[in-house]
Amino acid sequence: MDSNFIFGIIAFTALVLVLAVIILFAKSKLVDSGDITISINNDPEKGITLPAGGKLLGALASKGIFVSSACGGGGSCGQCKVQVKSGGGEILPTELSHISKKEAKEGWRLACQVNVKSSMDVELPEEIFGVKKWECTVISNDNKATFIKELKLQIPEGEEVPFRAGGYIQIEADPHTVNYKDFDIPKEYHEDWDKFNLWRYVSKVDEHIIRAYSMASYPEEKGIIMLNVRIATPPPRNPDVPPGQMSSYIWSLKPGDKVTISGPFGEFFAKETDNEMVFIGGGAGMAPMRSHIFDQLKRLKSKRKMSFWYGARSKREIFYQEDFDQLAAENDNFVWHVALSDALPEDNWTGYTGFIHNVLYENYLKNHEAPEDCEYYMCGPPVMNAAVIGMLKSLGVEDENILLDDFGG
């Protein structure tokens, strides 16, 4: 055998061995061996010890500390912000769309993107330590509109979810397959389902997923959690887009099924002032509106002036009408209005028509003495939210009086 060939093999093998030694040495320096410690809020009782590896979001969850992450750790929702004081390494490009330069300088990171390589020091909001997980039972899952179901969950006996009105929970789902043809939908809602042949869709999920949903229930509705879930069907102009994974899963649930939730989370809370409250909602954005209004009038017995403006396509898309009619009859300080954007001939609708932001402006805010002094609570489709915010800005309403829930629409 040629001596040069043999020498080449020996040299190549030696190079590989040297590189392997360098990598192992670097790893030993960059990653702690054995267990590492995560100091939390500079409180020895809150700190955790665990093996190095994985992401900070998962490390905290493994010790029962659940940080909100509607996307399940994919880095797309930006909810899992925590402050890493030391040990988190450099901020990653995947985080920069959710974290400003100022926040980055202050150590803010996305927990789902921070590698647990060594001991670190983090700051977490105190309310996170009240977050728990529960295995709930489906009580009912009924259509309230063409594309919206009301999911009602039973909390385990002896347990309670200590949430505030306007808060949200996260739902988990294991890998699954959902056939839309198996959905239980009343015939009164079949028109659009037949028109776009939505029954043909199948949602196949190969991984564990987590999503966030605002609660429609309010704190005095003990033992239950109630959600309004709009199914995310592919848009008519792009029918090949996969349907929404979690909404498809939720729509497939039946009474008696078990569902894992975690919470409570939230920041869309009512201000403790005497200012007038104006609620604006559309679609599944009804959920936090119901929670807030019921809480103000039923639990707090609030005397603040308040109105609710809800936008729907047609009469069949209005829900909780009897509940709000009753609240208006029982409370002189509350009124509510519905505007239909696409009323059907059979609706015989004589109420407001058009988009809700225009209706609110033309029929109330245009002649309001001081619209800038009101507090505005809104939740609905992104287009509605943007239109309402633009209208409020034109009236001189400051950001601090515009409160938006991004989940319910």
Curated annotation (Swiss-Prot):
The chain crosses the membrane at residues 5-25. GO terms for cellular component: plasma membrane. It is a single-pass membrane protein. InterPro entries: 2Fe-2S_ferredoxin-like_sf, 2Fe-2S_ferredoxin-type, Beta-grasp_dom_sf, Cbr1-like_FAD-bd_dom, FAD-bd_FR_type, Flavoprot_Pyr_Nucl_cyt_Rdtase, FNR_nucleotide-bd, NqrF. Keywords: 2Fe-2S, Cell inner membrane, Cell membrane, FAD, Flavoprotein, Ion transport, Iron, Iron-sulfur, Membrane, Metal-binding, NAD, Sodium, Sodium transport, Translocase, Transmembrane, Transmembrane helix, Transport, Ubiquinone. It catalyses: a ubiquinone + n Na(+)(in) + NADH + H(+) = a ubiquinol + n Na(+)(out) + NAD(+). Its cofactor is [2Fe-2S] cluster; FAD. It is found in: Cell inner membrane. GO terms for molecular function: 2 iron, 2 sulfur cluster binding; electron transfer activity; metal ion binding; oxidoreductase activity, acting on NAD(P)H, quinone or similar compound as acceptor. Residues 131-271 form the FAD-binding FR-type domain. Binds 1 [2Fe-2S] cluster. One of its GO terms (biological process) is sodium ion transport. Its main location: membrane. Belongs to the NqrF family. Composed of six subunits; NqrA, NqrB, NqrC, NqrD, NqrE and NqrF. This is Na(+)-translocating NADH-quinone reductase subunit F. It comes from Actinobacillus pleuropneumoniae serotype 5b (strain L20).
